Amino acid sequence: MSSGLTLPVWVAAAAKASLHALLGQPFAAQASVSLPDRPAPLLVPVISAARLDGGEQALAISRCDPGPGLDLTRDLEIWVRVSWTPDKQAGLTLLAGAGVGTRGAGGDLCVSAYARDLLERNLLPLDRGLTVEVVLPKGRELALRTSNAAFGVVDGLALIGTQAEVQRSAAPDQLKQVLLDLAQLTGDPEFRGDLILVIGENGLDLARQAQLAPLLKVGNWLGPVLVAAAEAGVQNLLLLGYHGKLIKLAGGIFHTHHHLADGRLEVLTALGFDAGLSLQQLRLLRHAQSVEQAFKALAAVNPAMAEQLGQQLALAVEQRSQAYVARYGDWPMRIGAVLFDRNRHLRWRGPVAGERFFTLMD
């Protein structure tokens, strides 16, 4: 596969190889991984697998290959140890080993529904319970270079992939695929004119948990997708994303890859000025390390103003997005915005989101 495979697929491959070792089956250099969106299994390379502790448990190792392009998981070793659960109850028990992210210190394994489904699909059914521990030896180190901490994920990398193949959010091919997906979605006879546009893996995972539909995931090419949605006949479009991402739209930045443009704290400071913040409060925003930290600093001195600024941000995202689309044509599509915070709470919504999508939120 030229696009490479996401981390959950490599975890599932190592887990399946580990289970085969536990069952006493001979080692195979490739694990057959069943995927929810493919009729045929995918053969995924595995480095090694062996029984441990006198056959009471087994360990297998795979190495992540995300395909071409920059990706911090490249060559990341994935260790998966499996053992039978003592009580012999059916089902999987997933454990976060070293280097795997959890929800807060000592919290649950941070795993997406897709990643969990892959493991269950490839390891079950069994006539007894199976404990699966995932270990990423370099996960804690690599997590420092991600935005995991902004979402409350600590101690390592989160297993939050929502598909098998890696998508490059800044690549032109990724935009082409999103536009094809948009055309297919809006061309469906069941399409009724509403669309939730989600930004990034966390947004997609959160939207699915909230049972929002229909969904279209977009990377950094937001501007062209907004215009294409209007052209395709979307009537009501809801933008759902992390506040640290959607804030760029409030500043008129519609290709959001950080290599091209940032300006997040500058935009937030300008919105704070419009909202009437004091000079001292504006300095808190301007010199914060992130949008999340800026809101926390403001909330510490004036919680009501922090909440007002968040609502102002959601409104600005709606207004600037609507103005962007209007530059290219006269369509009836209305754009709403909902922003979530590091705790993955749908925190702020603009007036259009409240008017057109309030049933999704309440």
From Swiss-Prot:
Q: Which UniProt keywords apply?
A: Cobalamin biosynthesis, Methyltransferase, S-adenosyl-L-methionine, Transferase
Tell me the disulfide pairings in this chain: none
Superkingdom is Bacteria
| Substrates-to-products reaction catalysed | Co-precorrin-5B + S-adenosyl-L-methionine = Co-precorrin-6A + S-adenosyl-L-homocysteine
Family according to the record: Belongs to the CbiD family.
- Respond yes or no to whether keyword Acetylation is given for this record: no
Gene3D superfamilies, A to Z: CbiD-like (3.30.2110.10)
Designated name of the protein? Cobalt-precorrin-5B C(1)-methyltransferase
Q: Name one GO molecular function term.
A: cobalt-precorrin-5B C1-methyltransferase activity
Record EC number? 2.1.1.195
Q: Name one GO biological process term.
A: anaerobic cobalamin biosynthetic process
